Swiss-Prot record:
Family annotation (Gene3D superfamilies): 3.30.1360.40, Ribosome-recycling factor
Classification via PANTHER family: MITOCHONDRIAL RIBOSOME RECYCLING FACTOR PSEUDO 1, RIBOSOME RECYCLING FACTOR
Primary localisation category: cytoplasm
Keyword field: Cytoplasm, Protein biosynthesis
GO cellular component, one term: cytosol
The protein's name in its UniProt record: Ribosome-recycling factor
Highest taxon in the source lineage: Bacteria
Amino acid sequence: MINEIKNDAKDRMAKSVESLKTQMSKIRTGRAHPSLLDGIQVEYYGAATPLKQLANVVAEDARTLSISIFDRSMIQAVEKAILTSDLGLNPSSNGQTLRVPLPPLTEERRRDLTKIVRAEAEGARVAVRNIRRDANADLKALLKDKEISEDDDRRAQEEIQKLTDSFIKLVDEALALKEKELMEI
């Protein structure tokens, strides 16, 4: 029973950290990365469709993305979707593919993005702590129902705290890495 609570907490904490990393990958740094365009939806035959289902996106070099669209008639729609996104990108078409040059980030924009990244990391820390709180509440319920002893409860809470500390450390490492990426020119 205690192991189920610990495993559940561990799985949920891992999902929180994974979610943070996914969110951070969508925040633009100075480098071109195909995942930058993952959030873009294109109007395709009346339905909003993710860009990655309509095209192949690759990093041509450190500052340029190349988009090979499977259906050539969709080039204008994809171009419009990128232009209207909040990424501030300006694609150019050569009839076959779209090239998306990434403008260098200004110092002010870097600071803004750093604030956003820190807020995301804090949200992940809060989520991890909430999971710890839920696990400890489950343990208290077991203790109250006399299904576990006080020693087992204390030991399990210490293990959950160690889990929490390790996942918060992962969040801090992800934050430090992203801040370093953002501050590189």
